[in-house]
Amino acid sequence: MPSMSFLILHGWQGSGPGHWQTWLAGRLRDRGERVSYPELPEPDTPRLARWREALDLELAREPVGLVVLCHSLACVLWLHHARVTDGYARAERVLLVAPPSPSAELPGVQGFFPLSVEPADVTRAAGSTEIVASHDDPYCPEGAERLYGEPLELHVRVVAGGGHINPDAGYGPWPAVEGWCLGSAEDGPED
């Protein structure tokens, strides 16, 4: 019987077989954990309303004690959700990996901004939320600390040379994120 439930949400264009999210979903399932790793609608041309509907369906199925892991544009999706959490169980922990900037030149990204979320919204949505990002992420040149960490009062773990923390940056298997999933909120994926 699974002891935890995990919801893994991909970003723009999804996460293919070589992505750390796909690897992580397999590792957690192999341990007998409950994992939902949905394909969000139209990942190449995402629309916030459609992605929110898909997230709402996932959250309606998930039990209390959910651990959520978001990559890239899914981080922004989660933050939109944090503004309106009525009727949904509070996530236990949330990890936002490589959130993009509104200036990122990705199709559909502009439709996810502006983002008007407050620290209290994030606190209501999850017991703990933290960010993992890199200073050299081409999709967040301003830096996740400046755009998200400071305004939302969230801890940002910096991955040196991590780029967008995807396969292009060497993030297929990522044991540190698996450790975060199975450990406490203090254990952090930094490499």
Describe the residue ranges of each PLM region:
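Active-site nucleophile loop of the alpha/beta-hydrolase fold
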Residues: 11, 40-43, 94-104, 134
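Acidic catalytic loop of the alpha/beta-hydrolase fold
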Residues: 15, 135-140
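Catalytic histidine-centered segment of alpha/beta-hydrolase-like enzymes
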Residues: 46-48, 162-174
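Gly/Ala-rich beta-loop-alpha elbow adjacent to hydrolase catalytic centers
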Residues: 68-79
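Conserved alpha/beta-hydrolase "acid-adjacent" motif
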Residues: 105, 138-144
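Short beta-strand/loop motif that positions the catalytic acidic residue
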Residues: 125-126, 130-133, 137
